[in-house]
Amino acid sequence: MRISISYPPIESRKGVPLLAQNRQFQYFNEPTYIYPVIPAYAASLLDDRGYDVTWDDGIAERLSLKEYVARQDFQSPDLIAIETKAPTVKTYWRYIKQFKERWPHTTIAIMGDHVTAFPEESLENSPVDYVITGGDYDFQLLSLAEHLSKGVALSPGFWWTDKDGTVKNTGVYQQNNDVNDLPLIDRDLTKWWLYVKNGNFKYEPGTYTMVGRDCWWRQGGGCTFCSWTMTYKKYQVRTPESLLEEVEMLHKRYGIREIFDDTGTFPAGNWLVQFCNGMVERDLAFKIRIGCNMRFGALKEEDYKLMGKAGFRFILYGLESANQKTLDRLQKGTTNAQAWETLRWASKYGMDPHLTIMMGYPWETYEDARNTVEFAKKVFRAGYAETLQATIVMPYPGTMLWHQCKENGWLLTEDYDRYDMREAIMKSPLTNDQVKELTQDLYRVFMEPRYVARKLVSIRSRDDLAFAQRGVKYVYGHLKDFAKGSELNSDEEAEPLQRG
């Protein structure tokens, strides 16, 4: 049985659609292709169990739709698995209709956070064969392959339309598999080289791991805006030893120099201590640099000291806003005081903190949003952060924030195509142009003389220089992403596929 793990290319005037491994979605003018870790696990697990697997990321490979279709014509897969998010789901519905007309005997499955929230919607709007809910695409796709090839009963979390038109399902998805049972990702099968150039990697080549699924912060259900609260209801993590094994393999076999572990929040406590000590004991510290997502207030100063010794570099923090009322409404469970202290510790022990910030909350005034901009500038001027990502807050369908929008009448549109960060989707005291202006203002912190001077002084190697040059390119790309008039309405209809 041949199985294609697929990201069919979307040719858009908005830019390059980046949906793989992204909790948020955006079209980019200067794209960074992120390694789709869970689909890569799926490919590796299926291959390990004897299935013929192809990796067809048409977006990262920059294929045209016609080139992607020609490849699938040649490969003739029995099953195509497609990951989607809200802003791409309508396009993929159109694609699936055309794919089923062209390949009527190929089974097509769709997966992702959006279809997890609304599984019946894809069955109603496309001839897709199966909707996979939950985030464990690896275990779920193995279940589907075993069902199709051997008649084994499907695990919970599948939706499909029966021959009589009745929608059926196997019940609510259950996150009950042991992630330690998974094989290490087959990096060659999953074309690791497509994803080595990432704006966040200072030392190239770099790659991604994901030791946990997904975030251990789930108080009140977790952050209200996070789309992955729908796919990962509980926190699961592999052992520190398994990640150390993977890190060592990546360094020795592929010459990887930097890794970002994209677990929603990296494990803390004794797990972190064991991992850091293992990096030192295996003589991996600084031979390969480590990055991760972390929460403000989650660690103590001694933890950051240990991480510094273990070779951690890039640490991503979700600041989101500098207004406590917003942090409370988002259920972040953090404060500005924690942010300041955490960033000071991380920078003190040699790490490069990265901030994610969002603009356009329904309850924030212009003054509130400006307060966030000024707090971020203060952090950068103090030297406590090195990079940032500024975006427009999106109420992804199915999230707690989206339900709040529905209850309060905050939504400006329910056209999924427009949930792509090119415009504000929620009613707000701010105009759309003000949201974009504030977002651009955040990126202009990189142009301040003090920041530029500090970065110039810090350049000590070719890696430093190359990283700074890439940073300039990405900053100008982001300024273009949020330029006035950058929003476009729904993309043109997908071109009909012709047999060649």
Predicted segments with their positions:
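Radical SAM [4Fe-4S] cluster-binding motif and immediate context
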Residues: N180, I185-H354, M359-Y361, E374
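Catalytic cores of alpha/beta
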Residues: P119-E124, D303, W363-K378
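Radical SAM enzyme core and accessory elements
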Residues: R2-I3, Q72-D78, W410, E414-G500
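Flexible glycine/acidic-rich beta-alpha junction loops that bind and position SAM and/or redox cofactors
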Residues: S12-V16, N270, K325, R329-L330, ...
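Short, solvent-exposed turn/loop segments enriched in Gly/Ser/Thr/Pro and often Arg
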Residues: P39, I59-A60, K85, T263-A268, ...
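Glycine-rich beta-alpha loop elements in corrinoid/cobalamin-binding modules
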Residues: I38-P39, L45-Q175, G398
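Short helix-capping segments at alpha-helix termini
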Residues: E101-H105, P127, V280-K287, F380-Y384
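Short glycine-rich His-centered loop
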Residues: I3-P31
